Amino acid sequence: MTQTFGENLLDAASTRGRLCVGIDPHESLLRAWGLPVDATGLAEFSRICVEAFADTVALVKPQVAFYERFGSRGFAVLEETIGTLRERGCLVVSDAKRGDIGSTMAGYATAWLDPGSPLSSDAVTVSPYLGFGSLQPVFDLAEEHGRGVFVLAATSNPEARVLQDQTDASGVSISQQIVNEAAALNAPHLAQHRAGNIGVVVGATLTDPPALSGLNGAILMPGVGTQGGTAQDVGTIAGDMAHLAFPNVSRAVLAQGPDVGNLRVAVSETAAEFPGFPRS
């Protein structure tokens, strides 16, 4: 039986903790690190991040857009970054936020989750706003290969509330519907006492988040660190799914680069802020 992404993530967390660190090589950060704003600078930035994070955190999240902006050379750097991280035992979620229908969605699924793809990752982020069912190709491939899918449910950007907080006739918000759909896909694994492959993205700064009890999948939680989310927030929102909650931090750690030692210290200090996700 193929081990699920949820199981792989819990295994990694048992030795590396429940922290996800983003690799976000945006232009201002490349400049701050004294690197050229081109594919060469991108490659050096990524190399430094791999050295700093590959053996210190459970989950690393490259932001695909910052590689895509450099075209084929950027994607070549991304391929190498993903491959090297995975070779060194670090789980990788590619933050691509893909969303489409039919054969096009199947193409995205193959690109990011098929073991034979040069971009093959442990997980990928996807957008459900063409309908949750439109994502079925990526769910199918995730189940086949034990890969993960993080579905955008309740994101931390303020613009999201006007859409994600809308409710149906029963008063259930769109974000809650997405969580419920993900939980339904994970239900067969719950019956086998295994964490499933389908996770959600839920911001750590939300005042009215969806209920996550029963999700049985990983929760990627942006909004901590620079954006103000705390361990208390993460624990309160995650509730009884806290063991599957992974706060995501990028800027607060990357600001300490480009020195590898300083980046590793920043990871250690940030992880210490989230040891047990205390709840009120």
UniProtKB/Swiss-Prot annotation:
Gene name tied to this protein: pyrF
GO molecular function: orotidine-5'-phosphate decarboxylase activity
Reaction(s) catalysed (UniProt annotation): orotidine 5'-phosphate + H(+) = UMP + CO2
Pathway: Pyrimidine metabolism; UMP biosynthesis via de novo pathway; UMP from orotate: step 2/2
Name the UniProt record assigns to this protein: Orotidine 5'-phosphate decarboxylase
Catalytic-site annotation from UniProt: 97
Lineage: Bacteria, Bacillati, Actinomycetota, Actinomycetes, Mycobacteriales
InterPro entries noted in UniProt: Aldolase_TIM, OMPdecase_AS, OMPdecase_type-2, OMPdeCOase_dom, RibuloseP-bd_barrel
SUPFAM superfamilies the record matches: Ribulose-phoshate binding barrel
